């Protein structure tokens, strides 16, 4: 999965997919009442990027729905996965469940079209703080009470705080999550980060009793870093330059081993060689 980073304006969906992305990451900020409000990152952000592009969250979802609904004039067949980077650090810990409930309602209405031919992309809820795991339970409860538990088949999870792998595993137990797990590792492109924790995550993914299904590394803009991540065995790379990742995947060393995921590739299944 080539994951376009910080896609917060509707116009950027086309831009990042046309550069080679089959996945996008979108920032979601919340108001004081835990309503998802804007797709907005703010300052500071990655080097070389504009930090302040934004939409109202529900409007972004409508644009995203068009981009992922077959037959729509804006449809992109290859856009198959969306990571919502949930900026919950503005919330109190006890608001996490409410944030999940309100997020589910927004997605149900504006993205899934109340279960009636909505957008088809798989969704990853990426949470920066282990203490906010009740966002997941609130989200699940709401889709169930609104009569659409089947949409949980399209939803996965990520804790993005670079926490100890063992602590993340314990948190998923508390949240009642037993699958659909992506594990991120990374840092802003302005700084360097080694691959030690990525390798630990990959080892967990490939062990018989691990909790991780997929591992992604962020934010990767350079060819050398891309090669390092691929050599470590990641499933996804988040980038400001999807074309750079696509180029490296075309190199003879990687062409035979990796391909770009399509809609038929289940993002919740651990890939077995």
Curated annotation (Swiss-Prot):
Glycan attachment residues as annotated in the record: 250
Location of the active site: 5, 41
Similarity comment text for this entry: Belongs to the arthropod phospholipase D family. Class II subfamily.
Coiled-coil region: none
InterPro entries per UniProt: PLC-like_Pdiesterase_TIM-brl (IPR017946)
Name by which UniProt lists this protein: Dermonecrotic toxin LdSicTox-alphaIB1aiii
A molecular-function term among this protein's GO annotations: toxin activity
Organism (species): Loxosceles deserta (Desert recluse spider)
């Amino acid at each position: 999965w080539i994951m376009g980073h910080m896609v917060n304006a509707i116009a950027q969906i086309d831009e990042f997919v046309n550069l080679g992305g089959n996945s996008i990451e979108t920032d979601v900020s919340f108001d004081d009442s835990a309503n998802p409000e804007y797709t907005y990152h703010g300052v500071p952000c990655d080097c070389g990027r504009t930090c302040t592009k934004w939409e109202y969250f529900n409007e972004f979802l409508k644009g995203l729905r068009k981009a992922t609904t077959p037959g729509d004039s804006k449809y992109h067949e290859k856009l198959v996965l969306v990571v919502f980077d949930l900026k919950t650090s503005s919330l109190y810990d006890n608001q996490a469940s409410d944030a999940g409930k309100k997020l589910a309602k927004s997605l149900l209405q504006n993205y899934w079209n109340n279960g009636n031919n909505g957008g088809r992309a798989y969704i990853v809820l990426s949470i920066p703080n282990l203490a906010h795991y009740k966002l997941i339970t609130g989200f699940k409860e709401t889709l169930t009470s609104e009569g659409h538990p089947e949409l949980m088949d399209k939803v996965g999870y990520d804790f993005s705080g670079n926490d100890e792998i063992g602590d993340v595993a314990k948190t998923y137990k508390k949240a009642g999550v037993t699958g659909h797990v992506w594990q991120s590792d990374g840092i802003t492109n302005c700084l360097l980060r080694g691959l030690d924790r990525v390798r630990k995550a990959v080892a967990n993914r490939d062990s018989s009793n691990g909790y991780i299904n997929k591992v992604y590394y962020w934010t990767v803009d350079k060819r050398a870093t891309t090669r390092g991540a691929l050599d470590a065995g990641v499933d996804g790379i988040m980038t400001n330059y999807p074309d750079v990742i696509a180029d490296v995947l075309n190199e003879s060393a990687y062409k035979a081993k990796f391909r770009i995921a399509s809609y038929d590739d289940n993002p919740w299944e651990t890939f077995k060689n």
